[in-house]
Amino acid sequence: MIFIKTTASAGTFESNDCLVTIKNAETLSIEIESVVFDQFGDQIHEVVLKTLKTLNVKNIHVYIKDKGALDYTLAARIITACKRLGVYHD
């Protein structure tokens, strides 16, 4: 029996971390829920876009539940979730 993954996650909902959940989509969409969104929402969005561009991923829905993760943590979680879903392209 073959199972096709439709969603993948990486991370935790602990302090200074984030939980990234991704799923296949028709277009790129990003949803961010963060305790520091007012201060760093634009920066978080930029890290997501930059990381997805590096991975050459365009058609995906990204949901991020953030508890103050640093940029490199956020990028690592996105990369891991993409690899788990199988949408990572070299």
Question: What role is predicted for each listed range?
Answer:
Residues 1-90:
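N-terminal intrinsically disordered, cationic/polar leader segments
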